[in-house]
């Protein structure tokens, strides 16, 4: 099985959508099998493929648009939109929000991601992270989708607005900030 999970990572790195589609259709269990970060030779920690797509976008190795294509392939072949949530792990929407994968985060919401989930019950939601990272389009979509705007995290006892005010460091010209 390890050879297949390494192959999934390599197919993401090569942006080989067709071969990945074929591999996952023949081995659908791989759609939820953890992989290390694409393009990173030192990473040893495995996470859900929908999470790792966000890592590749953050590293600017793939575009948001390519990330959406990859996510569609994984989802069409049985990937769980909430990744390893059932095991207490982070979810792909949390990864997208915290790793500046704005378009992909919106796609995850449209695909049914749990926008209310907090990692390890610490109160930090996708809205907290999108606010901190200055992702106004993702913040807007989360709010329009019913995300709790007054929820406080347990570490800083702060709302998403508090996180946004704290960071105010986004130099991203695509965002309104």
Question: How should these model regions be labeled?
Answer:
Residues 1-49:
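N-terminal segments that cap or nucleate solenoid repeat domains
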Residues 24-30, 70-80, 106-114, 140-148:
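Ankyrin repeat domain, specifically the short helix-to-loop turn at the C-terminus of the second helix
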Residues 46, 88-89, 122-123, 156-157:
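Start-of-repeat signature of ankyrin repeats
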Residues 87, 94-100, 118, 124, ...:
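Eukaryote-skewed repeat-based solenoidal scaffolds used as protein-protein interaction platforms
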Residues 137-140, 144, 149-177:
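Ankyrin-repeat and related helical/solenoid repeat scaffolds used for protein-protein interactions
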């Amino acid at each position: 099985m390890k050879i297949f999970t390494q192959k999934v990572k390599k197919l993401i790195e090569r942006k080989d959508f067709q071969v990945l589609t074929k591999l996952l259709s023949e081995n659908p269990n791989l759609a939820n099998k953890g992989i290390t970060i694409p393009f990173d030779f030192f990473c040893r920690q495995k996470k859900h493929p929908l999470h790792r797509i966000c890592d590749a976008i953050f590293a600017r190795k793939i575009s948001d648009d390519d990330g959406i294509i990859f996510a569609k392939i994984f989802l069409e072949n049985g990937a769980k939109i909430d990744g390893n949530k059932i095991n207490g792990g982070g979810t792909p929407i949390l990864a997208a929000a915290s790793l500046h994968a704005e378009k992909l985060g919106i796609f995850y919401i449209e695909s049914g991601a749990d926008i209310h989930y907090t990692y390890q019950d610490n109160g930090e939601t996708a809205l907290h992270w999108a606010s901190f990272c200055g992702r106004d389009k993702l913040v807007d979509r989360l709010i329009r989708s019913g995300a709790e705007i007054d929820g406080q995290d347990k570490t800083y006892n702060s709302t998403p607005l508090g996180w946004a005010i704290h960071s105010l460091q986004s130099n991203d010209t695509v965002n309104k900030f």
